[in-house]
Every structure is written in structure tokens, then in C-alpha cells.
Regions:
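Multi-pass alpha-helical membrane architecture of UbiA-family
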Residues: 1-212
């Protein structure tokens, strides 16, 4: 859709302008910020040109790049609390599962483009097994964040995630068409979007004090 609406030249121009602006504004923060965003931009380029078509590694790098900006600020301020890494693990596993669902969803197009994705090389059944393992692993940090860490009212979100992920696993077993994979993809996207808004629940009193 985007390829039909926007020319390649426009996309490249926008890409370079936005990257330049991100590095420019980062220079006002610190030299470390410039290094981080420069490395991040290079990582995106390297992934899109060299790693995107590599099964397993491409999915892993894509998920890593997706979570990197969210946790860079904690690294910058040297905040290495365990709860942050558990949150990062939860998000990483969720995004990695989403990347693999996208491969199932786009099998026909990837075959036409001669992409060697996991479901094309090893079959949809193998991909489902891998996704099931990832979702099972995602349940672990969800449980840890509920039982062992103070996440305020965000525990409600993680309880909801457990039920959604269990439902996801049931639907995954029964899925056998692109329509089913789109639904599964949307479930994971919903969990991620709700997670962003649920950050406000970590400390409701603090948020209310800032607003009022």
C-alpha cells in the first residue's frame, strides 16, 4: 500500500531527514545519545539490507531494535533495576512472537518475493511450535512482575495478558489461514498497545499529582 502511495525517492528523503534530526536533537542531550542513535540508525539500515531475510536472526534483531529505544533512557541514567530487565524480557518475547506471526501471515507474499522465512523453510507447524514456546516463555515474566515486583496497578494489565496469551495459544493451535494469523497478530498488537497505556498504572498517585 505504501509503495503505491509514496515514491521510493520520497521515502528515502524522509528517512534521511528524520535520521538527521534525531541525531541533531540527540547532540543537545549528550555525546552518548549521539553515539546511541547513530548506532541505532545503522542497526536499522543493516537489518533492512542484510538481515531481514535471514530466518531466526532477522526476527531476533528486529525484536531487539524494536525495544532498544524504550530502554535506552534507563541505561543512560544507569538505572539497572531488575524490574526493568524483566519488563524488557516480557516485551522482547512478545515482539519476537509477533514477528514470527507476521511471517505466517505473509507467507504467500514472501514466497513470491523468494524470502526464506521460517514458515517457508520449515513449515507452518514448526513456526507454530516456536511461537508457542515464545508465548509460554512470555508468561514467565508476566507472573514474576505480578508476584515479585511492585508495579502498582499495572499488575491488572499483566493478569489480563496471561488470559489473552492463553487464549492466543488456543487460537494458534486451531489456526490454518491468513485470516486466523491476522487475528493472532492483532491480539499481540493489542497487548503491546495496552502495555504502553498501562505504564500510567505503575504509580497512579504520582500521575495524579503531576496532572492536578
Amino acid at each position: 500500500m505504501l509503495d503505491r502511495l509514496v515514491s521510493q525517492r520520497t521515502k528515502l528523503t524522509t528517512y534521511f531527514v528524520l535520521n538527521f534530526l534525531s541525531v541533531f536533537f540527540a547532540s543537545y542531550v549528550s555525546f552518548k545519545a549521539v553515539v546511541f542513535f547513530s548506532a541505532y540508525i545503522f542497526g536499522i539500515w543493516f537489518y533492512s539490507h542484510k538481515l531481514k531475510r535471514v530466518p531466526f536472526l532477522g526476527n531476533f534483531v528486529s525484536a531487539t531494535l524494536a525495544i532498544a529505544p524504550f530502554f535506552a533512557v534507563f541505561v543512560y541514567y544507569k538505572n539497572f533495576d531488575t524490574v526493568i530487565f524483566v519488563h524488557a524480557l516480557f516485551l522482547f518475547l512478545l515482539i519476537l512472537a509477533r514477528e514470527m506471526i507476521k511471517d505466517l501471515e505473509n507467507m504467500a507474499g514472501d514466497m513470491a518475493q523468494n524470502y526464506k522465512t521460517i514458515p517457508i523453510l520449515y513449515g507452518a507447524k514448526f513456526s507454530k511450535i516456536c511461537i508457542s514456546i515464545l508465548i509460554g516463555l512470555t508468561l514467565v515474566p508476566s507472573f514474576l512482575l505480578i508476584e515479585y515486583f511492585d508495579v502498582g496497578y499495572m499488575y491488572i494489565y499483566f493478569i489480563g495478558c496471561i488470559f489473552l496469551l492463553l487464549g492466543f495459544l488456543v487460537l494458534l493451535v486451531k489456526s490454518n489461514s491468513k485470516k486466523h494469523y491476522v487475528w493472532l497478530h492483532n491480539i499481540l498488537k493489542l497487548i503491546i498497545i495496552l502495555g504502553v497505556f498501562s505504564i500510567l498504572l505503575i504509580n497512579v498517585d504520582l500521575v495524579l499529582n503531576r496532572i492536578l
